[in-house]
Amino acid sequence: AEAVLPYSDAGNQGLLAMMGLNPRFFGHMGASKLLRAICGPTVGAGLRMTNGTGRGMDALELEHSQLILLWGTNTKLTNRHLWPTIEAARRRGARLVVIDPIRTLTADAIDETRGDRFVQPLPGTDIAMMLAMMHVIIRDGLTDDAWVGAHTTGFEELRDAVAGWTPSRAAEVTGVAAEVIEQLALDYATVRPAGIRTLIGAEHHENGAMFFRTLGCLPALTGAWAERGGGIAKSVGSYSEDLIDVNALFRPELERAGGRREPRTLNMSLLGEILTSPHAGGTDGPGIHALIVWNCNPLATVPRAELIRRGMERDDLFTVVHEQFLTDTARYADIVLPATTQIESDDVVLPWGHLWVGWNGAAIDPVAESCSNTDLFRRLAHA
């Protein structure tokens, strides 16, 4: 049974669609389990190293900020329900700084005549800019010493670590002018409250955890956390256990048949290695001979796409994909099953930019032969 690998991710974000019935179905089968480590754990690990928690401020509190840094997030396009909150803050006089290696729709929304700014570091160099900002803040005595003394440890070590990261040095790495970095640091330390909004973009790249670990040091130095509208607002998945009892939906006690041992767990980020190794990427147990994919398109989203492609081309791999579209992954499937869209099924949805649970009510019946994820596994269990 461990030769079967269920492979899925967040899909349309519905909790039942993500983890409603599939763990029970594959758990009773004894199939390999999947460690969903490609999104979420990175940012949480990075912030916990600095803050001791993966949580941040409520994004809706950005309405009270006077300086908003949108760092690595195309908010106007991909987080549209938060944009009115940012616009409300701007009407109250807040300035907007967009930091992104790509000139996005959000970057185009800035207004330099009112003090907004677009800062465009080279890809993968954000950490150098953060270090230089901390260098300036400490050099110019702009730290909140009372906050640092009461709520942090390791200030001296951080001070020594950033001493060599001058704006000039960071400019050579990031491609951002030294004077821009200097002014950004001064603005961040002196305009209060200052809120940083970031999402999952950075964690999907090399050194993603270190991005968030370093970013977390900025509000700790300035004491931004002390004020409403100050701190870091990220995705709010870390609050999910406060919003809803997910175990009441997922029923983990129903996942294993009586007496069956716990199956092995495989890291979703290593799908290419798993599919091309006779022992599933060096783990104990058999190689993977059946791959069941839903809620994701790994050929487009998982590292080492060519290795995944090679694995999916194996003659001895049976692949089933439950999809709405003929994706890159679906093109390699032996069987493609039609999946419903978000508007065709009821579900419970947790938020990305606020602290309210959402109910997703179906607007139409499933089209033709398409079925929801929960219906798929219900039918398979009955078969």
Feature locations, PLM:
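Short glycine-cluster motifs
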Residues: K234, D242-L243
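Surface-exposed loop and adjacent secondary-structure segments within mature catalytic domains
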Residues: S240, V246-P252
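Cofactor-pocket helix-loop regions in the catalytic cores of large enzyme subunits
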Residues: A1-I232, E255-A383
